[in-house]
Amino acid sequence: MLDVGRHPNIELLVYSEVEKVEGEAGEFKVTVRRRARYVDEDKCTGCGACAEKCPTPVPDAFNEGLGSRKAIYSLFAQGIPSTHTIDTDYCRQFQGKKCGVCQKTCQADAVNFEQEDRIVELQVAAVIIAAGYDVFDPSLIPEYRYQEIPNVVTAIEFERLLSASGPTGGHLDRPSDRAIEAQLEGLEKKAKKSQKALKKLEEKFDETSAAFYKKFKNGAYGEDEDRQKWAEKYEDHLAVVKPMNELKKQAEGFDVAKRLAFIQCVGSRDFRFYPFCSGYCCMHSIKEAIIAHEHEPETTSTIFGMDIRAVGKGFEEYKIRGGSHSNITYVRGRVAEITEGSNHNPVVTYEDTRAREVTSQEFDMVILATACAPTKGIVELAKTVGVELDSYNFIKTSPLSPVDTSTPGIFVCGCAESPMDVPESVAQASSAAERAAELAFQSDIEKEKAVA
């Protein structure tokens, strides 16, 4: 990405949206709306001081909601450019509340709350659509209990947990454990605050809160308003300390997830949703299981699927190595349902077609390999650009020309065309770039003549 950002022949228009495409191959006029960041790209140094001081935490979409960011943020650390952006849906300044902390903090004077959208018009020879994809929402399959059982996560969420730059620093902390730790942290802050208030009263009356409260409950100080308030504060403190101590006992037994289950074809190869194979999921699950084993050698993984489609060069060897070196077990069969056992452990009920039996097994975490779905907004984009979609809402192409769309001069690559893995996406992107270069360097463009 850094090479792209520094390339003299590449202009990046990030945080932008294509509003109109007019013309024909070799002579397109593209209208782009550059959305207001409320941060000047030329002035912002990407130091992050504004985000550090911002008082508004927001669920972090890049980490799939498993962590938090601030209302002023950079999408991720390696993003190009490193300019920050203000999220107006959460920023206190845009919600009618007084704040402006980021503006006061920024030494480069880059924050500008008055910034507006800009319209940019481009003259281009060709257009390449590389809109990517979205993942299938597994909550549409109720038997998998996604978002009901905390330790059932998607493959993308698990990817962020494995990442050293993710919300857990690469440690496989279970979501249920992290939720309890967050709750415990909140209670500890409340307890510390109430303890501070009680300490002042103890110094004032020269008596411990516990000793005073025992006397108070026995009828002493009945009409003393100051001591009544002391008793109320002590009761509030006890109401915090009791659940806090219970959570501390639970947290003592926390450990990283070591028993993992990967469920394949969640939403794909399923006529209720997407009948096609998503292509990359099998190898992605194997890769995640291997990395999890590298993080914690005691980890065991079970991959449930109708079959494992290892179709690329070296893929079958990679699959076998995962089984022999990374404690991966491959189970041929479909998962019927997931229930919640003790300690928030998911219990998977499945059919093993080789053993010809239905059985259940408990795991620390379940990872759902979700289908590759057409990206949100692809229908509107297709209308704007003027290309056709197939029956699944991927960009329609010809089998003999897999990067050419229905409109000459407009090309497509990657998962905007169909589900595919990274090597295939790169190969198709190279093909689309070559086709676009033909138009860019062609002096005379032949136009089709109308035939009566």
Question: Model regions: which residues?
Answer:
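Extended, charge-rich alpha-helical interface modules
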Residues: E188-A239, P243
